[in-house]
């Protein structure tokens, strides 16, 4: 069966109780149930970096990927580490560039775009909203 890349900038939690944790696991399971070989690029930034290198090797070796499916976190991708510091801030954009370079179609489930609305600025203040807006937009670039 065809191979796909499944990406999430966080570790998956099969015991999650909220939709933002349940959905990624169910989507991963659904792709497997459909018969896809799933190349998993999830976990910590270090894990994703290692998995990205392995994926690059597979592509350079001629493996064909049908598509990439990505789940966003509820916070900016580069801030998903436990301390919210980006030890590998370019690993996820590098994955997207790699997919583009090899002509792999990509799909992104983007949740919680509350930061784009005026009430976010009112809740967190103008400076924080401006800074976070830049980081969120970087995710979408």
List each model region and its residues.
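Short N-terminal targeting/anchoring amphipathic segment
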Residues: 59-91, 103-109
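N-terminal subdomain of nucleotide-sugar transferases
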Residues: 1-46, 53, 63, 102-103
């Amino acid at each position: 069966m065809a191979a796909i890349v499944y990406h999430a900038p966080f570790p998956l939690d099969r015991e999650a109780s909220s939709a933002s944790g349940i959905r990624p696991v169910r989507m991963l399971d659904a792709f497997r149930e459909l018969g896809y070989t799933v190349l998993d690029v999830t976990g910590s930034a270090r894990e994703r970096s290692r998995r990205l290198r392995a994926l690059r090797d597979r592509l350079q070796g001629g493996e064909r990927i049908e598509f990439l499916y990505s789940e966003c976190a509820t916070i900016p991708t580069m801030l998903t580490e436990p301390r919210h510091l980006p030890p590998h801030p370019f690993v996820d954009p590098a994955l997207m560039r790699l997919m583009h370079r090899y002509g792999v179609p990509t799909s992104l489930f983007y949740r919680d775009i509350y930061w784009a609305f005026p009430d976010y600025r009112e809740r967190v203040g103008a400076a924080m909203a401006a800074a976070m807006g830049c980081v969120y937009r970087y995710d979408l670039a």
